[in-house]
Amino acid sequence: MKPLNDIFQFEFEKFINLKDVKKEFISSNQSEIKKVFGCIFIINFFKNRVETKRYYNSEFNMTFSLLLESSYALLSGQCRGSLLLLRSAQEANYKYVLECERRIMKEHDPTLAFEALDYRFGETQKKFLKDIKPIVNNIQFNEYYKSIERNLTYYKKLSGIVHSGSANIPIMSVEYFSNLYQDTILNKDEFFDLYHKVLNEIFLLNYFLMRESLEKWDSYVLYNTLRISFGDKRTNTLIKIVKGTK
């Protein structure tokens, strides 16, 4: 079997050579695009891995499809579209992870009852924090609790951007970042920074959802997986959290 990083490189080449993508844009922003693809790649890896795929049922398909559509919109020059799809993916994933946590809890205690979820992200956040408190150690998994809160912060920012007025939807030229501010009220660096942060928070919720399985993983395998998307320090920190080590 090929090393995971080799598979990633192969799949990334396929990704940036999809039909109708903007080649000049990809060439000048390849490192940023690679970060985007890296995060989606490891989400897909965990989704299909024998040890962790039980956390991803058919209802997760919507979240993953939205992530793929958002990344394709990015490569084809649809700035606002890519952020709108990313926000939809974030919203779908937020509810999905909470519903999975609830399902796992009910497997241990079928008598548990939970408040219904609605479309309001802020209300879901309150229920999220309340529901996991009895089962998730807020010291060991403090980063999980922080990610739940950060997701709401970035969701609000995305909402403000995708609902802002614009006369350029979508911008289809390879130079579209020259007009990015008018389209999204973000400059190029801010755009990618926000995109990466939202993707990171989507991943983190899924990562901590899988904590019971990941605790049993070989640290070397987990390191090589996370290293595709994160730096060495961040990778080691995430491993220590699920392993329960300081």
Which stretches of residues belong to each language-model region?
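A cross-kingdom marker of C-terminal helix-rich interaction/assembly modules
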Residues: M1-C79, L84-L85, E99, M105-K246
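Internal, conserved structured core segments that host functional sites
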Residues: L85-L86, N93
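Extracellular-facing segments of soluble proteins and assemblies that are Gly/Ser/Thr-biased and enriched
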Residues: E91-R102
